[in-house]
Curated annotation (Swiss-Prot):
Glycans are attached at residues 20, 182. It is a multi-pass membrane protein. The gene is aplnr-b. PANTHER family: APELIN RECEPTOR (PTHR10489:SF953), CELL ADHESION MOLECULE (PTHR10489). G protein-coupled receptor for peptide hormones apelin (apln) and apelin receptor early endogenous ligand (apela), that plays a role in the regulation of normal cardiovascular function and fluid homeostasis. When acting as apelin receptor, activates both G(i) protein pathway that inhibits adenylate cyclase activity, and the beta-arrestin pathway that promotes internalization of the receptor. Also functions as mechanoreceptor that is activated by pathological stimuli in a G-protein-independent fashion to induce beta-arrestin signaling, hence eliciting cardiac hypertrophy. Residues 1-38, 99-111, 174-200, 271-297 are extracellular. It comes from Xenopus laevis (African clawed frog). Gene3D superfamilies: Rhodopsin 7-helix transmembrane proteins. InterPro entries: ATII_rcpt (IPR000248), CCR1-9-like (IPR050119), GPCR_Rhodpsn (IPR000276), GPCR_Rhodpsn_7TM (IPR017452). Disulfide bonds join 27-287, 109-186. This is Apelin receptor B. CDD domains: 7tmA_Apelin_R.
């Protein structure tokens, strides 16, 4: 039994038509009344937190340019990718609140969908490069200077944005508006590239495109990097120098970012993979199972969206250097001095003064 299709009414990545996909009898429709009210509120919360948080990260990284760590450059671009996505959330909130009616025209339908997918790819690629950077810094600290130079980092960022842009292109090309009843919906339109009978193959291909290079492969690479890093740190744990301890603290922050990213995106990709297997005939889901997936899907998507506003708060919570930079660049020097006083009461006034400057500017 083939799937009825993954309704894209709550899915900004692949807007699948839940109705009659291949002439099959549809399952009972899911009641979306609760989602119409809840999801827009949730989107706007993510928008406000993501806009302010990622804006602070970008500003802080930009201001720290003379003494910027290599990791900071990737973190700044990660924040930029998240920011590009969260600015589209008011549009999706309006779309959902209006009962999935898109009043913004075809161009914004295409652009907003493109930015969502661009964010997903750019975020995971930035995290992968962050992990690789830590691998080089800790496992090959002496021989990796050239690979971690400013020019190499800029080249890697150019590759990240180029590949992210290319992988997100199907959304820009295939997404369009169409009238359905009294609503104008923002939907994937395969009519220009495929017959109705072959649409499932296009849907399956797009599903693989988002899950394999956008989640599974980067997660595998990051796991390999951290296995090597873990072995290195364990072997030399007792003899870590001060500089190595700084690398270890930064490593904890990056691992936290990766774990949170995986937790936020895993339910989305699991549901999408189950749908893909059902669509291609590898699974036979009952109507009740399909309805469960349909009901869970918007909330799995929301969890994925949360990742775009969480990262700045993770930096602030785990990274004293980032907090200090924020206080320093936004003029909260008294707050920073008080924080240092509480955490290091034995420091002399002169040491404390130099520590403020060091935390705010040192590599």
């Amino acid at each position: 039994m083939e799937s009825e299709g993954f309704s894209a009414t709550t899915e900004q990545y692949e807007y699948y038509d839940y109705a009659n996909e291949t002439g099959l009898q549809p399952c009972d429709e899911t009641d979306w009344d609760f989602s119409y009210s809840l999801l827009p509120v949730f989107y706007m919360i993510v928008f406000v937190l993501g806009l302010s948080g990622n804006g602070v990260v970008i500003f802080t990284v930009w201001k720290a340019k003379p003494k910027r760590r290599s990791a900071d450059t990737y973190i700044g671009n990660l924040a930029l990718a998240d920011l590009a996505f969260v600015v589209t959330l008011p549009l999706w909130a309006t779309y959902t609140a209006l009962g999935f009616h898109w009043p913004f025209g075809s161009a914004l339908c295409k652009l907003s969908s493109y930015l969502v997918l661009l964010n997903m790819f750019a975020s995971v690629f930035c995290l992968t490069c962050l992990s690789f950077d830590r691998y080089l810094a800790i496992v090959h600290s002496l021989s990796s200077a050239k690979l971690r130079s400013r020019s190499s980092i800029l080249v890697s960022l150019a590759v990240i944005w180029l590949f992210s842009g290319l992988l997100a292109l199907p959304s820009l090309i295939l997404r369009d508006t169409r009238v359905e009843g009294n609503n104008t919906i923002c939907d994937l339109d395969f009519s220009g590239v495929s017959s109705k009978e072959n649409e499932n193959f296009w849907i399956g291909g797009l599903s693989i495109l988002t899950t394999v290079p956008g989640f599974l492969l980067p997660l595998l690479l990051m796991t390999i990097f951290y296995c090597f890093i873990g072995g290195k740190v364990t072997m030399h744990f007792q003899n870590l120098k001060k500089e190595e301890q700084k690398k270890k603290r930064l490593l904890k922050i990056i691992i936290t970012l990766v774990v949170v990213f995986a937790i936020c995106w895993l339910p989305f990709h699991i549901l999408k993979t189950i749908h893909f297997l059902d669509l291609m005939g590898f699974l036979e889901l009952s109507c009740s199972a399909q309805n469960i997936i349909v009901s869970l899907h918007p909330y799995a998507t929301c969890l994925a969206y949360v990742n775009s506003c969480l990262n700045p708060f993770l930096y602030a919570f785990f990274d004293l250097r980032f907090r200090s930079q924020c206080f320093f660049f936004f003029g909260f020097k008294k707050v920073l001095q008080g924080h240092l006083s509480n955490t290091s009461s034995s420091l002399s006034a002169q040491t404390q003064k130099s520590e403020i400057h060091s935390l705010a500017t040192k590599v």
